[in-house]
A protein has these predicted regions:
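Conserved class I S-adenosyl-L-methionine
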Residues: 5-14
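Short beta->alpha hinge that forms the Motif I/post-I loop of the SAM-binding pocket
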Residues: 13, 33-38, 78, 103
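S-adenosyl-L-methionine
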Residues: 32-73
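Active-site segment flanking the S-adenosylmethionine/decSAM binding pocket
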Residues: 56-99
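Conserved SAM-binding loop of SAM-dependent methyltransferases across substrates and taxa
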Residues: 14-26
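C-terminal substrate-binding/active-site "lid" region of AdoMet-derived donor-dependent transferases
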Residues: 90-144
């Protein structure tokens, strides 16, 4: 549910940040990228697409976020620092919407409890499966990510 004027925080998803900047062309995307190679790729894509609505930062904390617009939506790739990142984002906007991406079943199964602990409700957990037909007309399964969503303050 991203609008053209939304402020979105994307953590560890360089291609998602670029897509979000295209969709929220009148808004702002705060891109947090820890990996240097991914950050360079994102910077190249920002230049290639002529995007001027992305602010790149290297971590999430109160200090790095203080001069940026307050996001209404956060998209995160699950990581060891995810709980701290979510808690920080909730301090900025207690009603923030979250979308978490993971390929790890255990992580997906644990997220509803983490969301409840942090006061995030309306939790939904879905898995997307994709199969591709190969040259021998057999279907090959692709990685099947879990998407976990929720909203703070409900």
């Amino acid at each position: 549910h991203m609008a053209s004027d939304d402020t979105v925080c994307v953590i560890s998803g360089e291609s998602i940040a670029v897509e979000a900047a295209l969709i929220a062309g009148e808004g702002t995307v705060i891109a947090v990228e820890y990996n240097g190679n991914d950050r360079r790729t994102m910077e190249e894509n920002i230049e290639q697409f002529g995007l001027n609505n992305i602010a790149i930062i290297d971590h999430v904390d109160d200090e790095s976020m203080k001069d940026l617009p307050v996001p209404s939506l956060a998209m995160l790739v699950a990581s060891a620092s995810m709980e701290q990142e979510i808690a920080c984002l909730l301090r900025l906007n207690p009603h923030m919407e979250f979308v978490i991406y993971t390929l790890d079943f255990r992580c997906a199964a644990a997220l509803p409890d983490l969301f409840a602990k942090l006061g995030i409700g309306e939790t939904d957990v879905i898995q997307i499966t994709v199969s591709r037909m190969n040259a021998k007309h057999n279907f090959e399964a692709e990685p099947a990510p879990w998407l976990i969503t929720g909203r703070g303050g409900v």
